[in-house]
């Protein structure tokens, strides 16, 4: 059966079958998967303890689930599944650092992460591990990080709210799985808190930029046309 948490990605889905954890990769995701596999990206990330292990298996295991099926992966079953709204401050911070460390390592090999959702991280004991192989895609020169706002909403902003105001974001997370938008967080912070470089650069500036973009009627096509050098990206 399909895992209820993997419904968003058109490139692949997670399934549970006969005690196995399987990942179906469809037409839309097979090129990026093959590029990362052939560049040995997955194996290096697994060896560093960043990424959950994987192995290709017979597509006949999932015969008939979708005509676009191209590859089937099997993953080890994690002993425990948790969610960001259940994590402690240190757990959320550790998951955020894993995400950044993995992303920097991928960029060094000309790959990147297509998103930055906290739900792509699980824990083995106290160690965070990345679980979404299909969000690892080839880096395109000049590309902006599509997951920047998502990283802020699901990692940085909840941590800032926790650190600056002493308010745990767990209940907020349960009500909005996308996390805390910069536009909302700015309303909760005082002027002294907004004056810190981290908050000014990653909350206030993002909030202003987003509001300006909405008011100007900017669309996704306009934003993706902008270019950013790799050193600036990093």
Identify what each model region corresponds to.
Residues 52-98:
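Conserved structural core of kinase catalytic domains
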Residues 11-35, 85:
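ATP-binding glycine-rich loop module of kinase domains
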């Amino acid at each position: 059966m399909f895992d209820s948490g993997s419904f968003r990605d058109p490139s692949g889905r997670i399934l549970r079958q006969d005690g196995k954890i399987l990942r179906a990769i469809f037409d839309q995701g097979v090129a990026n998967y093959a590029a990362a596999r052939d560049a040995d990206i997955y194996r290096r990330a697994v060896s560093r303890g960043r990424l959950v292990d994987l192995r290709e298996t017979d597509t006949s295991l999932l015969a008939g689930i979708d005509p676009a099926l191209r590859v089937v992966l099997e993953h080890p079953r994690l002993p425990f599944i948790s969610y960001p709204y259940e994590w402690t401050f240190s757990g959320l911070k550790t998951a955020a650092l894993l995400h950044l460390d993995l992303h920097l390592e991928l960029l060094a090999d000309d790959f990147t992460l297509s998103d930055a959702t906290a739900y792509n991280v699980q824990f083995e004991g106290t160690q965070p591990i990345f679980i979404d192989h299909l969000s690892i895609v080839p880096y395109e020169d000049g590309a902006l990080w599509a997951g920047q706002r998502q990283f802020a909403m699901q990692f940085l902003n909840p941590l800032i709210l926790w650190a600056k105001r002493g308010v745990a974001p767990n209940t907020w997370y349960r009500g909005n799985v996308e996390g805390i938008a910069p536009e909302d967080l700015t309303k909760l912070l005082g002027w002294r808190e907004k004056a810190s470089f981290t908050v000014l650069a990653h909350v206030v500036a993002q909030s202003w930029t987003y509001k300006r973009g909405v008011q100007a009627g900017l669309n996704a096509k306009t934003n993706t046309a902008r270019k950013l050098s790799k050193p600036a990206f990093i």
